[in-house]
Amino acid sequence: MREPVEQGDGMSRRAVLAAGATAGIAAGIVAALGSGTAAEAAPPVAGAPGPAADWFAAPARSVRPRFRWWWPDGLVNTDEIAREVDQIADAGFGGAEIAAVHHSVKDKSVLDTAHHGWGSRPWRDGVEAALRRAARRGLTIDLTLGPSWPVAVPGVTPDDEAAAKELVHGRAALNGGATFQGPVPPPVHAPAAGVTRQRLLAVQAARVEPAYSTRKETGLDPSSVRDLTSTVAEDGTLTWTAPDTGEWTLISYWTRGSGQQPESGPHSAPAAYVVDHLDPAGTAAVTGFWERHLLTPTLRSLLKAAGGAFFEDSVELETDGLTWTPSLPDAFAKHTGRPLLPYLPALVLSDSNQVFAFEAQLTRQIRHDFWETFSELFNRHHVRALRDWAHSLGMTLRAQPYGLQTDAIESAAILDIPEGESLGFKNLDDFRCLAGGRDMAGHTVLSCEAGAYNGSAYSTTWDRFLRTMGGAYAAGVNQTVVHGFSYATAPGASWPGFAAFSPYNGGPGYGESWGPRQPSWQHVGDIAAYLGRVHGVLQSGTARADVAVFRQTGYAATGIGASWFTATGVPLGWTHQFLSGPLLDLPNATVSGGRLAPNGPAYKALFVEGDFFYSSTPTLATADARRLLTLAEAGLPIVLLGAFDQPLTPGVPDDGESDRLRELLARLLGLPHVTRITDKAAVGDALAGLGVTPDVRHATASTLLNAHRVTRDADFYYLCNGKHAETVKPPVAAIDHQVTLRHTRRTRGGTTIPYLLDPWTGEATRIARYTEDDGDVTVRVALRPGQVMIVALGRPGLFGDRNGAEPHVVDTDASEVLFDGRSLTVRSTEAGTRTTRLSSGRTVTTTVPSVPAPITPSRWQLDVDDRYPGSAPTRTDHVHRTLTLDTLLPWSGIPELADSAGIGRYRTTVDLPPGWTSAHGAHLELGQVSDTARVTVNGTGAPPLDRLHPVVDVGPLLRRGRNVIEVEVAIPLVNRLRVAQPAVFGAVARQDFGLVGPVRLVPYRQVTVG
């Protein structure tokens, strides 16, 4: 069960969460309201006044992507630190997170931990240098709470009160009537190194019940559990005779430090050990170390100038048994009203596997109650406490609140910035879990540790990165922490420099080391600007989602989605987020106009199904059932899937609780806008019957994903032709179909104008062809795999547009129509007559004169800047060569370049006829090109390329006669590393990089519609 209960300071768990959110919501409303109403409130984007400003074209530093910046602890040079901050700033990024990570360094002694460890004077000097230069450059710097991960503190020993703890068990089998005499059974697992003390918590006996046994669990009769702790002699021996019937098991329970150190340590002297994440002592050890040893007056001042967030990585507590804290028995008793010890057999773990089990339903209920108690301790004493401490320093807390069996959705609501990851998250629903917590709490940012791929060091392409992140942005992500940027060098590093995760286990690691060492760094400003514009849109205003999916168990990073919505609803345009019980007690959890959280995500319906984490059992806590009833009575449509006419409590029920739950559900199901169904295929019809439709609609299923943000001025729709997970097969294909977008803002005169926002160029233009129906707008969406389109719906004149009064096109047989200045024009690649129907009712015919045929260049000159290891790990030698190509091939297919990496500049010429005029133009289609590329025509740079659809309009750069086209392509380093470091990279197959084509220049002619 989960009823609000009093905690030590007189606040219930739910009150704790609500209190943390209230201040954030109030601050957001005050900042956003201006002269508008609460329903219209929306924070400005990066301080910009709104869509009329240039915030989209030139995104602010605050919304630009960031780097995870890996240091070899404190073995850094302050001049190099300042130089790397400049490199990050010059490339157009917004900041960095300093993290002590050096998995690639096997011999840790070379890092001189005694003098240059995490937290040492050289480390502090490096942090100060980073903050000082960041303040000058307008960047912000984040700091991990400890070295590597999980959070650990130098000087804490495994036996300390503040150290992480485990509960381990011992066992002995007895036949009926047999006597056990001797030392209490010792733990089945030996203690970790450095653990010198362990305490006997309890000894129990229980009768084996084969009917409850599973493949891994020994079944026990719960009524037979006997506490033998008081019979243990002072010398640790036990004498006990089992009853005559059945087989019996003696179970001993021991508590001790887990002895876990942060990943790939040691990082400090003295060594750091992971802290207790469930007890105030663990948090106090973290904050106390910072206060006493790190936060000098200088550092405090610099944090105010350029500090961003403290960061905690995913909570990967490792133990052979059950993660423990001494207060768990008392906390469990306060939470449930029952003692914990009789239930311990159903809870103990060995190597992450359950050891014993009672009857299945009782076991489920016990485990639910335990992990809910565990979660409350984690969120209260760790997440909230660290967040409040960060605030006291003018910082925020960003964290990945998953890895334990805790309510990560609730954690996301407490955190200033929750974060997920592209490597560890199984699919987009993992991000939607965190997005629900963020949006219900009134926060803005959902961050993502982005771009780590197993075994892909020095072969990761930005194309792959963008395809990964395209879907994540549709699922709620709006900040990217790129994984990552390695400090230049470290002892033992090989060319092209220190890389935190490579080599890894003798082969290429995960996590790219971006920076000047990478050939694509010459083009990375285009990537940074693109990501900044996407972030700017997705951090503007308020996120909207169609449906809230209720989760009885708020885990994340599981890959478990929602019935119907994940597989069927999303391909039809629906959006959803996940909520857990504590979020229903937030100040934002109100209903108005049939919407839940109307000033936030404004969910149109709540969907409830059985608990996926417990065999889809139709469970509801009575407190949650009561809140659902209140929301439904206020007008919120609710759909329940499963046997919720016969609900069960998720935890062990109190006397009469099951009856109260059934009564609440009977009242809920009796309301007119509450529907119960038994087949997940009926979800769509149930929603339609309640009058609920999505904000984005298309007639047939599609791989189109969407995210919706609402500001005072506009509805922003982020559209991506993406996939639900990296492993989805078959691959995503190109799409081309009509999409209807709902406009939720009233405009003067009732006119809704759609604008196309190009995140590659920063241009915002009125869309020329669309249909409108009562404010809803239907546009054509044609996207290649992974490609993105951003549409804004708003009033005439947004983004400086001057065409708002002009009629638009509702139908045409022209391949393209657009507004050019104040004129509506037809663009065609072929001569002929084009018929266009306008919104004014007029039908216009336009004659397109002759258009030159597409041109395929037949010969290319390729100038190569080939890169080799230099005389030092950070030194690169350059060899220049020139080739003439009659056929475009990947470098791996050109003998002279098969193992090359660097920059290739492809140059060709095309001749355009004497009749070429300003009415002509052309698109340059590059075909297959990898990795990054830039185009120059007649010495002038073309607009940035869409990396996932490398076609660029070069019309304004062309002239009659001879034209010189140059394509500069960056080639990743892996092919060179295959031969330079064969012990690490030799097993990697040659990669096909370069300009492969086919390349075409496709002329068009543009004619004004009469």
Regions found by a protein language model. Name each.
Residues 1-11, 25-26:
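N-terminal secretory signal peptides
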Residues 15-36:
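N-terminal export signals
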Residues 31-48:
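C-terminal segment of N-terminal export signals and the immediately downstream linker at the start
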Residues 82, 118-147, 155, 300-309, ...:
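Carbohydrate-binding surfaces of carbohydrate-active enzymes
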Residues 149-152, 165, 171-175, 184-224, ...:
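An acidic-aromatic loop/edge-strand motif
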Residues 778-780, 951-956:
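Exposed aromatic-hydrophobic patches
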